[in-house]
């Protein structure tokens, strides 16, 4: 039976199918922040692919804890990059399908913000949650304040396995899930720049 997440988790919660998070893990931090701000609005409303979700630079700055002058550029760049993103899957009949996250982006210079138009396929993914589509949830404000490149990914993994009391991950899986560059094959770099930095920030800023 599907869960009515609009009732249980309002727009200040981040609720995503686990497979959706796997698709967006290669995005930049600013793209992920924009996605995190926009998706709860898509989940809790009845918008279609013809309806925009507006994210202002002032809201982006406030929720992410960054300066407004930085937010203008970060939001526009993230909007542009998110528009180029797509993900793929293989249908039951063997067809290989590619889907864009967004069908249109309008940067409203006079209003200092971006209008995002999600595709119908993505809107369905953002609203469909049941036993066949497991999901992970956490407060939006927690992850938006994380500033290290991989802290958000680590936090999602921790929340995904929270009911188990912890989790183990191999180095190969860590590289795949975080899409780490080859430079982190050196264990010292991996520990200092990814694991230690992300753990320190998430432990300090999250539940």
Please identify what each model-predicted range represents.
Residues 1-207:
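Charged, alpha-helix-forming regions
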């Amino acid at each position: 039976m599907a869960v009515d997440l609009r009732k249980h988790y309002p727009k200040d919660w981040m609720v995503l199918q686990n497979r959706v998070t796997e698709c967006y893990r290669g995005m930049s931090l600013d793209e992920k922040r924009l996605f995190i701000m926009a998706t709860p609005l898509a989940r809790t409303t009845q918008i279609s692919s013809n309806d925009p979700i507006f994210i202002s630079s002032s809201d982006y700055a406030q929720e992410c804890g960054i300066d407004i002058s930085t937010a203008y550029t970060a939001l526009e760049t993230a909007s542009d990059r998110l528009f180029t993103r797509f993900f793929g899957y293989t249908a039951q009949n063997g067809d290989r399908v590619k889907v864009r996250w967004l069908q249109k982006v309008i940067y409203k210079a006079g209003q200092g913000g971006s209008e995002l138009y999600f595709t119908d396929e993505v809107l369905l993914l953002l609203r469909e949650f049941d036993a066949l589509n497991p999901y992970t949830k956490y407060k939006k404000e927690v992850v938006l304040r994380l500033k290290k490149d991989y802290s958000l990914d680590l936090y999602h993994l921790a929340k995904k396995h929270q009911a188990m009391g912890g989790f183990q991950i191999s180095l190969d899986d860590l590289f795949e899930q975080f899409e780490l560059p080859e430079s982190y094959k050196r264990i010292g770099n991996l520990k200092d720049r990814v694991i230690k930095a992300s753990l320190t920030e998430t432990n300090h800023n999250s539940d």
